[in-house]
């Protein structure tokens, strides 16, 4: 019945700050869409929609709180390269590299947080 995930939505206090961070730090591409100029961040065949907390015409989960997401991104880079890049941009790695099990099997992951506190995992299947 299901074949994949199209997008996820992050409830945000500061849309511009979040969009800027994901563009500059992770290299995601900003997309403005819809009549009310919603902001999404695209990468590969996926996207993250940034929803302002309190948006009246945009349905969301029952708890409208920033910093509650836990997202795993996949990289084809060596994690040592990713760590060096993130450190250069001032991002604190809070855990890793550590072994994890992803949807395709064993992977190695590092963890950091976005500006509003959501947990971001960056994983590689190529390091095992």
Please report, for each region that a protein language model flagged, where it lies by residue.
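Conserved active-site tyrosine of GNAT-family acetyltransferases
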Residues: 18-25, 86, 117
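Short, conserved charged micro-motifs
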Residues: 17-19, 78-83
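Conserved beta-strand-loop-alpha-helix junction that forms the acyl-donor binding cleft
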Residues: 12-14
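Vicinal oxygen chelate
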Residues: 1-4, 28-76, 83-113, 125-128
């Amino acid at each position: 019945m299901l074949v994949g995930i199209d997008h996820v939505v992050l409830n945000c206090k500061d849309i511009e700050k979040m969009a800027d961070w994901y563009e500059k730090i992770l290299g995601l591409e900003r997309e403005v869409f819809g009549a009310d100029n919603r902001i999404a961040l695209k990468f590969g065949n996926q996207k993250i929609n940034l929803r302002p907390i309190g948006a009246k015409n945009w349905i969301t989960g029952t708890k409208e709180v920033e910093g509650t997401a836990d997202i795993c991104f996949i990289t084809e880079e060596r994690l040592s390269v990713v760590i060096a890049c993130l450190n250069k941009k001032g991002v604190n790695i809070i855990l890793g590299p550590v072994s994890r099990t992803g949807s395709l099997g064993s992977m190695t992951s590092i963890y950091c947080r976005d500006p509003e506190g959501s947990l971001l995992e960056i994983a590689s299947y190529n390091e095992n």
